[in-house]
Structure formats: C-alpha cells, structure tokens
Amino acid sequence: MAGSEPTGLAPDDDRHLGAVLALAERSRREGHHPFAAAVVGADGRLLAEAMNDSRRDRTAHAEMNALRAAAEQHGEAALAGATLSSSAEPCAMCAGGAYWAGIGRVVYALSETSLLALTGSDPENPTLALPCREVFSRGQRPVAVIGPLREDEARRAHLGFWKEPSQPDLSQT
C-alpha cells in the first residue's frame, strides 16, 4: 500500500474511517440517515463518534454531533488540530462547524457529488453543491482535506435508502 496512500494520510486514518463506515451502517439500521463521523485527537486518540440524528433536528448531522460530543467530553482545546473523520464529505454547515471548532484535518469517504447521485432530489437530504474544500478555502486558517476514500464501501450504506427521485439540476449553481 506504500506509495498509494493520499498525501497527508496519517497511519490511523484508514482504521478510524473504517469504524466510521461501520457506524454509518448502524445508523441506517437504527432508523437514522446513513451517516457517521468521529473526532480523532492530534495524538490519534478517539475523542468522540456520532451518528446522524436529524429526525427532529435537521442540523443534528453526524459531524456536528461528534464535534459537540468531543468538546463536551474533552474540552474545546482538544479539538485544536484534531481530525474529523466522516462517512461522507461534510456539508457546508458541518464544514463551518469543523472550522470554528478548530479542526485541522478532515478525512472523508463518500464525496458530495457521489452522495448527490445516490440521493437525487430526495427531500430528506437537500444538497448544497458546495464542496467542503471550497468552504475551508474561505477561512483564515488552513484545514487539510483528504478524500474521497473508500467510496464504494461508503456507498453501500446508502443503496436503497433514498427514494428514487429525478436528479436535480445543479447547472445553475
């Protein structure tokens, strides 16, 4: 595998991403949207993990839940330079949350473009065509982004979950 790893991939990134993908499958089995995320400290220690829970609160995305849990359990300082590992590319809201939480790196599996191909215009998952790299590029400090990784594996949690709507037209964005 040496030489084939994306630039910036830390030794434990793949292991943490695998755990997040398994948690996304569990999220689906428990009746939530099939997303999960984890916050990993700069020392490689798992600080928090979370599933999507947006049935009553559409902002309760896995990334936001993991960021909040990590801050509550370990203090805000623990998030400085930490890695957000996510089953899918963080949306604009979650990218903003990661930025303001002090996250230094984002590692994700399924790209926003691939997710959109799976969800189409399903009202359960309205998509903003705004990659997290673009959100982070507008900030005053850098956030490294690594992904997509393991997309085929990440896609499995979504297959058959979303309705079969027509694809939205994002050409005007």
Regions found by a protein language model. Give the residues of each.
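Short beta-strand scaffold segments in enzyme catalytic cores
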Residues: F35-G44
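Signature of N-terminal electron-transfer/Fe-S-associated modules in redox systems
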Residues: M51, A60-E63, H74, A80
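Conserved redox-active cysteine motifs that mediate thiol-disulfide chemistry
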Residues: A88, A92-G96
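Short beta->alpha transition motifs characteristic of CBS
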Residues: L47-S54
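Zinc-dependent deaminase
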Residues: M1-S27, G97-T173
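Small-residue (primarily alanine) positions within well-ordered alpha-helices
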Residues: V20, A24-S27, A37, A48, ...
